[in-house]
A protein has these predicted regions:
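A surface-exposed, charged beta-strand/loop segment in the N-terminal or early-internal portion
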Residues: 1
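C-terminal outer-membrane beta-barrel translocator/porin domains of Gram-negative envelope proteins
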Residues: 4, 14-195
Length: 195
């Protein structure tokens, strides 16, 4: 399940603020079939996305979005978005006040503790008619600490696929990418990263 609470507001004509006060994600696989288990064994990337996870996070996102030139045609557009997210500190504080030591769990699942920041800039320039030249820069970093040795799989970064470089398969380039020297390598290397 997933539940959250936050506020969105415009601080000016070109700027938007999003304050996510609390978001809770809980993933727990209750029962599986033999066919499902076989599929998970054959594809570790999919199996990672089904791991039990408890993520309690909060964050803030600032967006600047401005159209330059003729607004109707959106000749030029610049969008810059920066965000910071923290996970697990509220629960860690409660557990510390209660005197809990070791791995802290909620509903039998360890909760994640991490901090993550991202910065994205997109520039669009109308060349002729509906044709545009678009450039995008995205950078992000995340760090796990406290109750976690790594950030949750769903919070990690990857490159490729429909929302990134469409000419490349998802997770085939960028952070954590790996290309075996052997054509039929039986090893699997997870291809996500914290930067």
């Amino acid at each position: 399940f997933n539940v959250g609470f936050g506020y969105d507001w415009m601080s000016s004509k070109y700027t938007k603020n999003q304050l996510n006060l609390f978001e809770l994600k809980y993933n727990k696989l209750i029962s599986t079939t033999p066919d499902f288990d076989k599929m998970m064994d054959e594809n570790p990337s999919i199996a990672l996305s089904f791991e039990d996870q408890f993520i309690a996070k909060a964050g803030y996102t600032f967006t600047f979005d401005r159209v330059f030139g003729r607004r109707r045609f959106e000749d030029k557009r610049l969008t810059v978005q920066a965000s910071i997210t923290e996970g697990g500190n509220l629960f860690s504080g409660i557990w510390s006040l209660a005197g809990a030591d070791g791995t802290k769990r909620l509903f039998g699942t360890p909760f994640s503790q991490f901090i993550k920041g991202t910065l994205q800039a997109v520039y669009s320039h109308r060349v002729v008619g509906q044709h545009r030249l678009v450039g995008r820069v995205f950078v992000g970093a995340a760090h796990a600490y406290g109750n976690s040795s790594e950030i949750p799989y769903t919070e990690q970064f990857y490159v490729g696929g429909a929302n990134s470089l469409r000419a490349f398969a998802v997770r085939s380039i960028g952070p954590g990418s790996y290309h075996s020297e052997k054509e039929n390598s039986s090893g699997y290397y997870d291809q996500t990263g914290t930067f």
